[in-house]
């Protein structure tokens, strides 16, 4: 197993320091080659925060009693006193990077970059940029050059910003796909309004739950599918008068 890590002031202890908004206390990487597995279990968690980035292979986490598989690009965040249990397997050549951090405004900082209090795992993106940023933080902790603590905060914030942009991009794509799907549904209902249309059947035929279809149709079109069909029928009847 390849490992490279560094610690603030060479301390292996959990650091809790609220004197500054955000403080990086340690950073490192693991890459499994021949070792069969690498398991971490902290029943009472740690006193600080931790963010784990899966760069290659897979990582297996237990989060809120559920087993979760993290693929490349996934980020997992642990908060103070949160139970930690995760495992990496050598035959999957897993590569992960991790960073521990503390500070007086950590919650606000995470929220600012789209990581709300109930979020434990999210997709940050499978980008080489993250490897570079993690390695820069490791190097800063190892070399301790002038103003390195400020540089650590700067690099970590850059990482959080990149992850936030990825989430915003993913949300935008999801909304765009949903809007196109609802436009197609509206076009179909508009063309076949005079036929016997069962909303539930349409949703099932297009692999959508009925509640999801109705909710997103209303959000995109401004009315429910049934109301939309009725409005078309009423408009047609008025034209025939």
Positions of predicted regions on the chain:
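Short helix-to-turn junction characteristic of helix-turn-helix DNA-binding domains
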Residues: 54, 189-192, 241
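Short, structured helix-loop boundary elements
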Residues: 21, 48, 127, 131, ...
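Short acidic-glycine-tyrosine-enriched beta hairpin
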Residues: 65-79
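Generic protein-terminus/edge-of-domain signal
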Residues: 1-69, 90, 107, 113-120
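Basic/polar phosphate-binding segments, predominantly the helix-turn-helix DNA-binding elements
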Residues: 162, 184, 190-235
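Amphipathic alpha-helical segments enriched in hydrophobic/aromatic residues interleaved with Lys/Arg
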Residues: 108-174, 187
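Ligand-binding loop in jelly-roll beta-barrel domains
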Residues: 67, 81-105
């Amino acid at each position: 197993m390849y490992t490279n890590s560094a610690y603030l002031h060479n301390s292996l202890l959990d650091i809790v320091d609220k004197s500054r908004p955000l403080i990086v206390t340690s950073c490192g990487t693991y890459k499994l080659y021949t070792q069969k597995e690498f398991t971490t279990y902290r029943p009472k968690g740690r006193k600080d925060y931790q963010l784990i980035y899966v760069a290659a292979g897979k990582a297996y986490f237990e989060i809120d009693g559920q087993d979760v598989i993290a693929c490349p690009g996934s980020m997992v965040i642990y908060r103070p006193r949160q139970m930690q249990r995760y495992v990496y397997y050598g035959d999957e050549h897993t590569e992960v990077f991790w960073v521990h951090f503390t500070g007086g405004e950590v919650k606000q900082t995470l929220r600012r970059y789209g990581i709300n209090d109930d979020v434990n795992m999210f997709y940050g993106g499978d980008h080489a940029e993250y490897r570079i940023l993690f390695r820069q933080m490791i190097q800063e902790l190892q070399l301790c050059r002038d103003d390195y603590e400020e540089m650590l905060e700067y690099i970590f914030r850059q990482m959080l910003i990149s992850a936030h942009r990825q989430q915003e991009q993913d949300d935008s794509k999801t909304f765009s796909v949903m809007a196109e799907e609802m436009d197609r549904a509206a076009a179909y209902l508009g063309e076949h309004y005079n036929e016997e249309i069962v909303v539930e059947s349409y949703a099932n035929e297009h692999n959508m739950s009925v509640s999801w279809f109705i909710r997103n149709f209303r959000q995109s079109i401004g009315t429910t599918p049934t109301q939309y069909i009725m409005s078309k029928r009423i408009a047609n009847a008025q034209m025939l008068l």
